[in-house]
């Protein structure tokens, strides 16, 4: 019965709860407000202040559900929707004014810095093609080419990255709206979901650069109907799904319940380094559940695995001890040091060392220092993952910024799991997103910057079962277990009582009556006394 209550069988209460999470998850965002942006521009140490949480309801609903023929697998996608929770966020609002790192400008500049020749060649080609369509320009261009055959009208030292970046530097004001620093004054509404506009009413070279940005198809940037663009950190997650999952229903093998078989039709990723062509490294393996549920009977399990599409990787969580939630016994699991603190060839997982952020603060082997993970290949942007407030990160990063206060109670990833059903009772996925801020040759705004791993925001995505769900588990599981516990002790007590009564009954049934014993005993005694001649009394009578 316990196993059947954890299997994913259609038209059962368990299936309905799996299909639509019966309560919204909490999605909390903490943004790092920069208090000295202009000092940072001058090369000083940044100071940040955490502002949050900005709380959102996260609703999840599975659709496109299809079962395999033998019902052992189920395919689905999961829609997500975010709604601002003004009450839980109070006194903070989505319209608060904050100063944050200008992520999209910083990202675009770093990408152009590393791919300048390719980018410049592409947008020069676009501009040339556009000009060729204008008759007057075409005639003038032909005349210039005849007098200067080595260079066309737009050939500006094509092989020189330096000159290419100078060209881009001249267009920054048109693309990003006259920025006076690498920081942005914005609101949580714009920065997180609605979008920060850029590439508005651009022409010429600026328009060509914006076209190159559009071609990258970065998920945090959306093209608007008028051709302009908007950057937002989480809008790509809103009213969308993160792909198609195929998971085990547990009908044939309960120990595999909710374990992922395929994601988008594959059991491997292509985001991390593979040791050889045609092979897949362990960094690219898709293993575990999606974290919304686990197989039953977790007692004695030392380690579990979660696949997170948000960070394009599998994460191990280890058992750290017993716990409880609202009176329900649980097992607590947390991420271990392999998640962020032990990455590199010495740990056998250097496939995570993608080394895609030039001029970053890295070890000699190209890996980031302890506590940081390069997500460039996951985000298609130079984003770095850490624990909140860079908890556990190397001093090469933490010593360069003021305002970080790591606290395991607030910042550790954890989940409390009910051991018999594998149900998560309470938990939080807590991660921080950062970017390297550094000098880029020929970009004036970056001239005096010191290379720093700069915190942008951290999130806590989690669940704490509400009263209704706690009551459901208490009624359907804990009271049954309590009843079974009572029955067990009644049976033990009954057994002990029987163990005491049965020998007594047996002894009574086996014991002879008193009338049959006395004559025999008397006769025997008299006979012995006479023959011994006085062993028990005086001399025999004469």
From Swiss-Prot:
Q: Which UniProt keywords apply?
A: Cell membrane, Disulfide bond, Glycoprotein, Membrane, Olfaction, Receptor, Sensory transduction, Transmembrane, Transmembrane helix
State the source organism's domain of life: Eukaryota
Supply the InterPro entries for this chain.
Answer: CD36_fam
Q: Where in the cell is it found?
A: Cell membrane
Question: What topology in the membrane does the UniProt record assign?
Answer: Single-pass membrane protein
Q: Which molecular function terms from Gene Ontology are attached?
A: scavenger receptor activity
Write out the GO biological process terms: sensory perception of smell
Any idea what job this protein has? Plays an olfactory role that is not restricted to pheromone sensitivity.
Q: What tissues express this gene product?
A: Detected in the antenna, legs and wings. Higher levels of expression detected in male compared to female.
Extracellular compartment residues = 1-487
User: Which chain regions cross the lipid bilayer?
Assistant: 488-508
Q: Which residues lie on this side of the membrane: Cytoplasmic?
A: 509-542
Instruction: Kindly indicate where the leader peptide sits in this chain.
Output: none
**Protein name as annotated:** Sensory neuron membrane protein 2
Glyco sites are at 33, 128, 238, 274
One Gene Ontology cellular component: plasma membrane
Q: Which family does it belong to?
A: Belongs to the CD36 family.
Which cysteine pairs make disulfide bonds?
283-351, 312-378, 353-367
